[in-house]
Amino acid sequence: VTDYARHIIMQGPTYGLQTDLTNKDLCGFVSNPMEHGEASKLALYGVADYSWNIANYNPLDNWERGLVDLTPEAHEAYRTFAMHSCDTETGYRRIESWETKSFRIDNFTDAEFNALQSEFVRVKNAPAQMEANCKNALLMKELRPWLTEFGKLGERGLKTMSLIKEYKAGNDQAFWEGYVNNRMSKEDVAAYEKHKSGTMV
């Protein structure tokens, strides 16, 4: 969940586990929550499922079920946050934002643009949806600093999408002014670096 990357609260699937182990290979399996006990439950859900039925363990299926079981009233918003909060920046975990396709500013289709814009809307709205619907107050207390920065990420992403339109339309002045206004201040950067998500969007 945090472990060796305290600025990222990893909420992605528990993957990379061998599924051909038997009782001849091991006699037990130990795992523990990190300092954010409630936020650790999604990973522990994966570990529990794996240790119960190793041969049939499916990390993505397990993760999807875990989101629903842990936050049934807010699982879509939690899913949006969790999917974009997986990468450690160390190269150990690399699967993040796997449903999001990015593109170069000079090479994209309308469908790709609309899909990415819609994802940034979901990112922007996820924190408020979690606040309104998630009944686990302790989980919200743990996630709130990251959710705050996640919402800001969505806002910056949507502004960036608007900049792409200005660029394509040849509105150089509007593009430049929008770019300058969308830049993060030193304080913004410091807050984001402390509670980071969306590192691979």
Enumerate the language-model features and the residues they cover.
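Substrate-binding groove of N-acetylhexosamine-processing glycoside hydrolases
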Residues: 1-201
